[in-house]
């Protein structure tokens, strides 16, 4: 899977722009606030139907305009496709090859993407919801059953919470059963996803890219290492029954997969408590690389890998090691305020961005 071109109209600081991408490394440099990150955001919006910078896509509309339009052409399984997103105050329209995409479930996974940015700090110091989102986006891009199960789970959870708020308990058991059945699949999927990521992290760590990192998955539903869905279904049933009185008082469901979390550990110590800022940034880069390899193992093809403001937290040695891995990661976009000092392949492209003007840069150090 390769992105061939990207077109932007009335998006952020871009009135109109179009860029053709290298199938390998795309290095984008320029001063701050010129539009580098906006290019990555555009690809993210096209791929996932959401932004990593705002919950309201209308905030990305060019000042004074009524809408924005994004379009990418991409090659997948030997065929070329066009994917577009139109956003105005009335809503969002997504088309693939001119056919409407009506739900995000249809969109997610069509163009797998992984983003490494400063916002990844939330995976260390943010709320549990930030870490669940990481797992949900990864698994939804790789497993159609997971994304559908997650959607049904959230619907059932909403129904149960509505009944709790209005103290209507007569049909709670119906929703409890749905939550237990759907929730067990989510929990088991998340557990094994973390275990596979841990294996990939160790492979990357063996290349001496960073310290030893481990994801410690935390769920109250897994008892004594029993990972059978039947056991987890029964455990969630039990917890929902036990917590009913408290849930009625709170008007919300206090147990289940929507309360799960994970902790990043370095050499069996909490990254949040015992790592320097530089270590944290390097370890998060490792985690995102592992995410790329996870998706690659599922699809036998690399996702689009985007790295924003790469010099903000990594030194030149770490960046060189990332670039050495780039050929195994497929198509990559990397933004920075600096011209690259590391060697790139002949098929790489270097772009400079200045006041939303994108230019091909002639500076290229070839391996």
From Swiss-Prot:
HAMAP family in UniProt: RecF
Organism annotation: Chlamydia caviae (strain ATCC VR-813 / DSM 19441 / 03DC25 / GPIC) (Chlamydophila caviae)
Claim: Transmembrane helix is one of the keywords in the record: no
Single GO term (MF): ATP binding
Any one of the GO CC terms: cytoplasm
Protein purpose: The RecF protein is involved in DNA metabolism; it is required for DNA replication and normal SOS inducibility. RecF binds preferentially to single-stranded, linear DNA. It also seems to bind ATP.
UniProt protein name: DNA replication and repair protein RecF
Subcellular compartments: Cytoplasm
One example of a Gene Ontology biological process annotation: double-strand break repair
Major location (coarse): cytoplasm
